[in-house]
Swiss-Prot record:
Keywords: Chaperone, Cytoplasm. Belongs to the SdhE FAD assembly factor family. It holds the Pfam family Sdh5. It is found in: Cytoplasm. It comes from the Bacteria. It comes from Vibrio vulnificus (strain CMCP6). This is FAD assembly factor SdhE. An FAD assembly protein, which accelerates covalent attachment of the cofactor into other proteins. Plays an essential role in the assembly of succinate dehydrogenase (SDH, respiratory complex II), an enzyme complex that is a component of both the tricarboxylic acid cycle and the electron transport chain, and which couples the oxidation of succinate to fumarate with the reduction of ubiquinone (coenzyme Q) to ubiquinol. Required for flavinylation (covalent attachment of FAD) of the flavoprotein subunit SdhA of SDH and other flavinylated proteins as well. One of its GO terms (biological process) is succinate metabolic process. Disulfide bonds: none annotated. GO terms for cellular component: cytoplasm. The keyword Transcription regulation does not apply.
Length: 86
């Protein structure tokens, strides 16, 4: 769905202003993005447009996005990172 150039832009957008987000978002992109459905990929790209404080709150489980696509994607990101810890 995305061209190589578009994926490079998405990869760049995964670089956040907070190290705490970098260590969860970038590995998810690198290891899971290609396996996502087209809709999930769009949700992921849309999620990257959110502000870091909001994304951090959602990833830490202190809140939940009202956008169902974003909430679902955060769940996938968190689950992916938890699977690496176990």
């Amino acid at each position: 769905m995305y061209t190589t150039e578009e994926k490079a832009r998405i990869r760049w957008a995964c670089r956040r202003g907070m190290l705490e987000l970098d260590v969860v978002v970038m590995p998810f992109f690198e290891e899971c993005f290609e396996k996502l459905s087209e809709q999930e990929q769009r949700d992921f790209v849309s999620l990257l447009e959110c502000d870091d404080p909001d994304l951090f709150t959602w990833v830490m489980g202190h809140g939940r996005s009202e956008n169902l696509g974003h909430a679902s994607m955060v769940d996938k990101i968190v689950a992916h990172n938890l699977s690496k810890v176990r």
